[in-house]
Design a protein with these regions (language model features):
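Non-catalytic substrate-recognition/targeting regions of SAM-dependent transferases
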Residues: 1-13, 174
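Class I S-adenosylmethionine-dependent transferase superfamily signal
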Residues: 48, 120-121, 147
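Short beta->alpha hinge that forms the Motif I/post-I loop of the SAM-binding pocket
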Residues: 61-65, 112, 135
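Conserved beta-strand signature within the Rossmann-like core of class I S-adenosyl-L-methionine
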Residues: 127-134
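Core SAM-dependent methyltransferase catalytic element
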Residues: 159-182
Length: 182
């Protein structure tokens, strides 16, 4: 795969190690529709769309330039994907996904990423899964504790190079109400 990048987007010089670890940890198949939340220039969404071409893939990011690059990268790599400029889940209201993939923007702060986790839990279809990668030293254990308040199942599926890949399933029934308090 070939990716266009630019200044002002995350990991513009090379594939982020966390993204690489997340993609390698995914199972043999994932269910669609798929959301790449905080897509940046589209690495995760494009890789998933290329690996499973029959899946409906949506990519969302707050950064307009990142969205433009994600569209370009999907086109370059022959992947059909919808790309939305969205502050978190704002442009996705009412949409539901079977799989949500995320390399969260840690530098945005805990309040922002925890809001994204809560909104993700509320945006899953029944049986859906939220997959994310986070470095241990950047808060993976505390993120797991928070995720356990949203999901019945939170598992570490991979630990590699200081990165933890988490898979969360079975959002609590009251997750949509809980997102109002984040």
């Amino acid at each position: 795969m070939v990716f266009a990048t630019d200044s002002g987007v995350f990991s513009r010089r090379e594939l982020d190690r966390g993204t690489e670890v997340l993609l390698a940890a995914l199972p043999e198949s994932v269910a669609g529709p798929v959301l790449d939340m905080g897509c940046g220039y589209g690495t995760i969404g494009v890789a998933v769309g290329a690996r499973w071409p029959g899946l409906a893939v949506t990519m969302a990011d707050v950064n307009r330039r990142a969205c433009d690059l994600a569209r370009e990268n999907a086109r370059r790599n022959g992947v059909r994907a919808e790309v939305l400029e969205s502050d978190g889940y704002m442009a996705l209201t009412g949409r539901r996904f079977a799989t949500i993939l995320q390399n969260p923007p840690i530098r945005a702060g805990k309040a922002v990423i925890y809001r994204m986790f809560a909104d993700g839990a509320a945006s899953l279809l029944p049986g859906g899964r939220l997959w994310l990668v986070i470095r241990k030293q950047q808060g993976a254990p505390s993120a797991m504790n928070y995720l356990a308040t949203l999901f019945d199942e939170v598992a570490v599926v991979e630990k590699k190079s200081g990165y933890w890949v988490l898979c969360c399933a079975a959002p609590h029934q009251d997750t949509e109400e809980a997102t109002k308090d984040v």
